[in-house]
């Protein structure tokens, strides 16, 4: 089990990127959250099986027809054993 914090730069807001991220996470049974930041980046924390997580990150980095990822900053985080779902966060609150 592994957890990472990711900041994604590029054309990633207003193009359905958070929904794409959520779909790909759920498809791989990953948990965590994703949200838009005021600076135009998308931020997320994701955890799960290490191979599923790597496949998820590779897929996210490739983007979509509308979302273009320029750069991803990835840092390890402590695993949260209490987390059971992957959700889209709205606003600045958790």
From Swiss-Prot:
The active site is at residues 18, 36. Its EC number is 3.6.1.7. Residues 3-90 form the Acylphosphatase-like domain. GO terms for molecular function: acylphosphatase activity. It is an enzyme of class 3 (hydrolase). Coiled coil: none annotated. Keywords: Hydrolase. It catalyses: an acyl phosphate + H2O = a carboxylate + phosphate + H(+). It comes from the Bacteria. PANTHER family: ACYLPHOSPHATASE. Belongs to the acylphosphatase family. This is Acylphosphatase. It comes from Geobacillus kaustophilus (strain HTA426).
């Amino acid at each position: 089990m592994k957890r990472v914090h990711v900041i994604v730069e590029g054309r990633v807001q207003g193009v359905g990127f958070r929904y794409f991220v959520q779909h790909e996470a759920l498809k791989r049974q990953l948990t965590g959250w994703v949200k838009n930041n005021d600076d135009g980046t998308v931020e997320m924390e994701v955890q799960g099986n290490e191979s599923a997580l790597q496949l998820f990150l590779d897929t996210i980095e490739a983007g979509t027809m509308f979302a273009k990822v320029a750069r991803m900053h990835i840092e390890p985080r402590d695993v949260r054993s209490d987390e059971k779902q992957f959700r889209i966060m709205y606003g600045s609150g958790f």
